[in-house]
């Protein structure tokens, strides 16, 4: 679908130079002389390579139309995942690296979204918010928040380390915001 360059947003998938690119970041620029343009950081969905591209704000871009379908994660190994379509219960096997570094969030029976283009699966997304248990945290020293940060490092059940507020203890369940791998809130019981 053709759109204007000024319509580009992070998360869009563009057809550019006979390949599909995911727009990661954008920056609108209005130089003193000449027309406005958009500087986009993009990721090639097939190779994973990063690329920077300029688009004229009034120029045309071609946005790819992707099909989204929800699948339930059943099981996996080091390189492959088996998932089941929630509508027709068809099971398929996909490469684990299609999730990239977000595969650490996979849990049994988790619903993930697979994105396909012309019948070929090109990308996958985990939910934006995932609840995980804290396995280990650093001890908090009384008065620590006065002189330093009010965050400490916690090890989660998926062996990931993230910064959490000092009131989080080992055994607590927290919600992690997966797009930037950050603490969101303490899980509600």
From Swiss-Prot:
<dbReference type="GO" id="GO:0005737">
    <property type="term" value="C:cytoplasm"/>
</dbReference>
<dbReference type="GO" id="GO:0003746">
    <property type="term" value="F:translation elongation factor activity"/>
</dbReference>
<comment type="similarity">
    <text>Belongs to the elongation factor P family.</text>
</comment>
<dbReference type="Pfam" id="PF01132">
    <property type="entry name" value="EFP"/>
</dbReference>
<dbReference type="InterPro" id="IPR011768">
    <property type="entry name" value="Transl_elongation_fac_P"/>
</dbReference>
<comment type="pathway">
    <text>Protein biosynthesis; polypeptide chain elongation.</text>
</comment>
<keyword id="KW-0648">Protein biosynthesis</keyword>
<dbReference type="InterPro" id="IPR008991">
    <property type="entry name" value="Translation_prot_SH3-like_sf"/>
</dbReference>
<dbReference type="InterPro" id="IPR014722">
    <property type="entry name" value="Rib_uL2_dom2"/>
</dbReference>
<keyword id="KW-0963">Cytoplasm</keyword>
<dbReference type="Pfam" id="PF09285">
    <property type="entry name" value="Elong-fact-P_C"/>
</dbReference>
<dbReference type="InterPro" id="IPR001059">
    <property type="entry name" value="Transl_elong_P/YeiP_cen"/>
</dbReference>
<protein>
    <recommendedName>
        <fullName>Elongation factor P</fullName>
    </recommendedName>
</protein>
<dbReference type="InterPro" id="IPR012340">
    <property type="entry name" value="NA-bd_OB-fold"/>
</dbReference>
<keyword id="KW-0251">Elongation factor</keyword>
<dbReference type="GO" id="GO:0043043">
    <property type="term" value="P:peptide biosynthetic process"/>
</dbReference>
<comment type="function">
    <text>Involved in peptide bond synthesis. Stimulates efficient translation and peptide-bond synthesis on native or reconstituted 70S ribosomes in vitro. Probably functions indirectly by altering the affinity of the ribosome for aminoacyl-tRNA, thus increasing their reactivity as acceptors for peptidyl transferase.</text>
</comment>
<dbReference type="InterPro" id="IPR015365">
    <property type="entry name" value="Elong-fact-P_C"/>
</dbReference>
<dbReference type="InterPro" id="IPR013185">
    <property type="entry name" value="Transl_elong_KOW-like"/>
</dbReference>
<dbReference type="InterPro" id="IPR020599">
    <property type="entry name" value="Transl_elong_fac_P/YeiP"/>
</dbReference>
<dbReference type="Pfam" id="PF08207">
    <property type="entry name" value="EFP_N"/>
</dbReference>
